[in-house]
């Protein structure tokens, strides 16, 4: 199932049955055994965060970083030249339980480590809960433009916006995990681009650009 919403400033797509080959089941089991959760409390937002590794989480990250998957994200968003941050700055796993919520906010737009602009966000949801609707607001944060109740093994892809905030409503019961993956793009240009340059060898007649 795929649902697309284009609000001029944000491209938003929602998918169900996102992960295959029982990877969702393996990840859910792995997350339930994690003990190193850290509390996240900021501006009326509260949940738990995990920035570590795991057998199945590492497998998922390899998949999300792979050439075929990045190409798929480019096709879905119609944004070429996307790259990943191998250090995963700001990425991780969130755990939201009863009374947890994420207040409406604008994401960070610049990754200083790789010197690139944040372009696309991918969220993968595991587990079941009541409440916890994902929502996107208009520029004035007065009207909800999009609202979805992510089910187990669903995903959301949306492009970065400097004006349209998003957030997660309060969880009323249950437990849900979300995995964050970001994709970046450079707006830099090169004044004199070229391929590999070699010293000219008169004996082999090697061209300078081969």
What residue spans do the PLM features occupy?
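Non-heme Fe(II)/2-oxoglutarate
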Residues: 1-76
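Charged, low-complexity, helix/coiled-coil-prone segments
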Residues: 2-20, 92-104, 123-126
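A structural signal for well-ordered alpha-helical scaffolds and beta->alpha junctions
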Residues: 4, 8, 12, 53, ...
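A generic secondary-structure signal for well-formed alpha-helical elements
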Residues: 15, 22-26, 68, 77-81, ...
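Short secondary-structure capping micro-motifs at structural edges
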Residues: 58-60, 78, 106-111
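A short coil-to-beta-strand element that immediately follows conserved catalytic motifs
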Residues: 80-91
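Catalytic core of Fe(II)/2-oxoglutarate
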Residues: 94-100, 104-120, 126-210
């Amino acid at each position: 199932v795929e649902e697309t919403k284009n609000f001029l400033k944000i491209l938003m797509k929602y998918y169900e049955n996102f992960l295959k080959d029982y990877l969702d089941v393996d990840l859910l089991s792995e997350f339930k055994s994690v003990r190193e959760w850290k509390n996240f409390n900021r501006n009326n937002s509260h949940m738990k965060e995990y920035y570590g590794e795991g057998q199945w989480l590492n497998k998922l990250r390899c998949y999300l970083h792979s050439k075929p998957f990045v190409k798929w994200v480019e096709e879905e968003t119609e944004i070429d030249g996307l790259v990943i941050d191998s250090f995963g700055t700001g990425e991780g796993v969130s755990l939201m339980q009863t009374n947890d919520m994420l207040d409406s906010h604008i994401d960070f737009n610049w990754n200083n480590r790789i010197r690139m602009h944040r372009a696309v966000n991918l969220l993968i949801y595991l587990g079941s809960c009541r409440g916890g609707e994902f929502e996107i607001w208009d520029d004035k944060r007065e009207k909800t433009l999009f609202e979805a109740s992510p089910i187990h093994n669903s995903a959301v892809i949306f492009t970065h916006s400097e004006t349209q905030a998003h957030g997660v409503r309060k969880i009323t019961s249950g437990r849900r995990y979300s995995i964050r993956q970001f994709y970046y793009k450079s707006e830099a240009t090169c004044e004199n681009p070229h391929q590999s340059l070699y010293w000219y060898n008169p004996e082999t007649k090697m061209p300078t650009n081969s």
